[in-house]
């Protein structure tokens, strides 16, 4: 399934409400540009794990640095070949799957090994600490955990699934 948005604000809303595996965004968009969208996403614990590719017609070092510094996993200048974009998408998705596979094979590996960003690392440490502290609590529920993490149960599910491949 492919989701489309006419601007960065709509895209951010779509990403927060749907399960998304990858973002491909143009830099030049109305209301919220691609740099802002990427920065917002990479600083939002609910969606920071989603790989992000920025596309641009700007051919200068400052623009490229701005894109990568906003958190983009890849930055491609237009015009680009569809083969190159396909390879980039494949590599990002494959590395995410390898990370998930590694965790599935070694479920007791340090949770920090799942983090793809500092935001994810903080999230995973907080989640792990809470679970270790409350594991003996018979009343522990997904709702309590989501509340502690400051997100809805569906956002918590998407985040954990996105980072670990587990539900």
Language-model features, listed with the residues they occupy:
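Acidic, metal-coordinating helix/loop segments flanking the phosphotransfer/catalytic sites
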Residues: 4-22
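Receiver (REC) domain active-site loop signature in two-component systems and cognate sites
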Residues: 29
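C-terminal output helix
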Residues: 80-89, 93, 101
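Basic/polar phosphate-binding segments, predominantly the helix-turn-helix DNA-binding elements
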Residues: 142-167
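A Lys-centered signature of the CheY-like receiver
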Residues: 76-78
């Amino acid at each position: 399934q492919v989701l489309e948005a006419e601007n960065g604000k709509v895209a951010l809303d779509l990403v927060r409400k749907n399960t998304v595996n990858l973002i491909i965004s143009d830099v030049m968009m109305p209301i919220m540009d691609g740099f802002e969208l990427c920065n917002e996403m990479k600083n939002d614990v609910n969606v920071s794990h989603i790989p992000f590719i920025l596309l641009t017609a700007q051919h200068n070092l400052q623009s490229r640095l701005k894109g990568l510094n906003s958190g983009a996993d890849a930055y491609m200048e237009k015009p680009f070949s569809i083969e190159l974009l396909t390879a980039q998408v494949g590599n990002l998705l494959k590395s995410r799957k390898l990370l998930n596979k590694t965790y599935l094979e070694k479920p007791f590996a340090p949770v920090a090994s799942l983090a793809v960003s500092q935001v994810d690392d903080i999230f995973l440490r907080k989640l792990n600490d809470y679970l270790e502290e409350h594991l003996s609590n018979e009343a522990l529920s997904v709702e309590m955990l989501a509340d502690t993490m400051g997100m809805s149960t569906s956002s918590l599910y998407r985040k954990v699934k996105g980072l670990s491949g587990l539900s």
